[in-house]
């Protein structure tokens, strides 16, 4: 899907978002609009949203009522035909792939900690369950950055989309980048120390 098509979808959907979804929680709006920009139909998103308002899956009803966001997404995904096993396996496959992308175990742990504690983890699980690859997931993260209203965001400039209240959503892309830089610096320090010891 081209940036122009994504922009068109986002502008049209954002103008009428409250007619389709209860956006009292802005994070939810971001996810619904992100899914819409990925080409997921309104009917499928509505099915997920309906599950948010009336969770019927016994295994996760209490967690959903307690506000555990990740569990609530699992409930919603079951409403469109995915099983708990599907969701769990998707997450495991993603984290296994992620492990091969980092040299050290510490780097892997930092990355997974970041992804498990913010909206990125949810988007990765949804995207993976829908069969999307890393490049398309990156577009979703770019969209979230644009949705934050960050005028310095490359995605915001490309899509020419600026929203108010940028502090509502975590800047997951910057957080991830900072963690990666910190890990690389730590690895360089370790290599330098090892070289000194070897002398």
Each predicted region: which residue ranges?
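Amphipathic alpha-helical segments that form the core helices of the histone-fold
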Residues: 48-57, 140-148
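Metal- and O2-centered redox machinery and metal/ROS homeostasis
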Residues: 56, 61-65
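Surface-exposed, Lys/Arg-rich phosphate-binding patches that contact polyanionic backbones
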Residues: 130
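Intrinsic disorder/low-complexity detector
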Residues: 2-31, 66-125, 154-198
């Amino acid at each position: 899907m081209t940036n122009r098509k994504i922009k068109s979808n986002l502008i049209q959907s954002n103008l009428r978002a409250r007619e389709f979804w209860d956006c009292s929680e802005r994070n939810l709006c971001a996810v619904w609009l992100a899914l819409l920009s990925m080409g997921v139909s309104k009917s499928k998103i509505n099915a997920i949203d309906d599950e948010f308002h009336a969770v019927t899956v016994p295994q996760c009803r209490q967690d959903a009522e307690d506000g555990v966001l990740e569990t609530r997404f699992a409930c919603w995904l079951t409403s469109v035909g995915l099983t708990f096993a599907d969701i769990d396996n998707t997450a495991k496959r993603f984290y296994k792939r992620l492990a091969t992308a980092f040299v050290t175990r510490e780097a892997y742990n930092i990355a997974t900690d970041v992804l498990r504690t913010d909206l990125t983890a949810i988007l990765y699980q949804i995207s993976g369950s829908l069969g999307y690859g890393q490049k398309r997931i990156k577009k979703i993260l770019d969209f979230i950055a644009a949705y934050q209203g960050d005028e310095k965001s490359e995605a915001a400039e490309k899509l020419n989309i600026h929203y108010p209240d940028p502090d509502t959503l975590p800047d997951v892309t910057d957080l991830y980048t900072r963690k990666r830089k910190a890990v690389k610096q730590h690895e360089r320090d370790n290599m330098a120390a090892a070289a000194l010891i070897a002398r």
